[in-house]
Amino acid sequence: MAERGLRKVRVGKVTSDKMDKTVVVSIETSEKHPLYKKFVKRTYKLKAHDENNECKIGDIVKVMETRPLSKEKRWRVVEIIERAR
């Protein structure tokens, strides 16, 4: 059997849990501005599969890349690192 390539793993915060078995995760990165050389925070959102509807808004979660599960879902929740208070 051929080995599978490394899958991307990201850590982010759940910003929406209104969908069934799906959460929206916001991931914040900082990158250097090409002209001004200042570090700028950028936030991007992705939809992740949450099989048991365990995640709530504010949870810190680890997501892993997976096969396409729907039109926009290509990530799944691996673990909940920290629960929201």
Swiss-Prot record:
PROSITE patterns: RIBOSOMAL_S17
Pfam families from the UniProt entry: Ribosomal_S17
Alphabetic keyword roster: Ribonucleoprotein, Ribosomal protein, RNA-binding, rRNA-binding
BP-aspect Gene Ontology terms: translation
Any single GO CC term annotated in Swiss-Prot or TrEMBL for this entry: cytosolic small ribosomal subunit
GO molecular function, one term: rRNA binding
Primary role: One of the primary rRNA binding proteins, it binds specifically to the 5'-end of 16S ribosomal RNA.
Oligomeric form and interacting partners: Part of the 30S ribosomal subunit.
Similarity-based family: Belongs to the universal ribosomal protein uS17 family.
Name by which UniProt lists this protein: Small ribosomal subunit protein uS17
Record gene name: rpsQ
